[in-house]
């Protein structure tokens, strides 16, 4: 930072000249917002910190720190503090901790014959704040099958401790009941 003063003709002017400034990168993780502080050469600024929400968040040796999710999402303006004593304002989008579980489920129509065995394939995805995260965060996963016969009588079957993985489909084999009218898989 330089302060330049020009004086001439009984007038003076001052200018503050700043060459570069720290800025931040924000990425959503499963635990919150990972903030990386970069210096004016776009390299991680180890030892820097962020003042946000009345708290000081210290950065690690890679210039990263974790800010927890918010109950009120939106654009936020923290203060970046560098190791050489400078401070600067920055902006980032603060997300809320909202989980969503979606699943692609496939059951071959050709296997829906009375008494036949059919394989249900399930491919779930779990997201937090719109970012995919590992399925290992799920506990007590179960598959619920509701079959309804031609008389309108429904039968519910639950598969407890249903094993799911991020890299492959989970499968479960069922026997198709007689007089099946509809099957609902959850």
Which residues does each predicted region cover?
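N-terminal, cleavable Sec-dependent signal peptides of secreted/periplasmic/extracellular proteins
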Residues: 1-186
């Amino acid at each position: 930072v330089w302060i330049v003063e020009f004086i001439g003709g009984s007038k003076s002017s001052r200018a503050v000249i700043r060459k570069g400034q720290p800025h931040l990168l924000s990425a959503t993780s499963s635990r919150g917002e990972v903030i990386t502080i970069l210096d004016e050469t776009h390299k991680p600024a180890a030892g820097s910190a962020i003042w946000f929400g009345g708290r000081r968040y210290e950065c690690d040796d890679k210039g990263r720190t974790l800010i927890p999710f918010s109950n009120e999402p939106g654009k936020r303006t923290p203060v970046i503090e560098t190791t050489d004593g400078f401070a600067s304002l920055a902006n980032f989008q603060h997300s809320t901790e909202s989980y969503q579980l979606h699943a692609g489920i496939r059951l071959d129509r050709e296997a829906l014959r009375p008494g036949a065995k059919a394989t249900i394939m399930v491919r779930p995805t779990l997201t937090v704040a719109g970012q995919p995260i590992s399925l290992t965060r799920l506990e007590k996963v179960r598959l619920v099958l509701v079959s309804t016969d031609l008389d309108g009588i429904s039968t519910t079957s639950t598969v407890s401790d249903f094993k799911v993985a991020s890299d492959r489909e989970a499968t479960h084999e069922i026997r198709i009941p007689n007089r099946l009218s509809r099957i609902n898989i959850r």
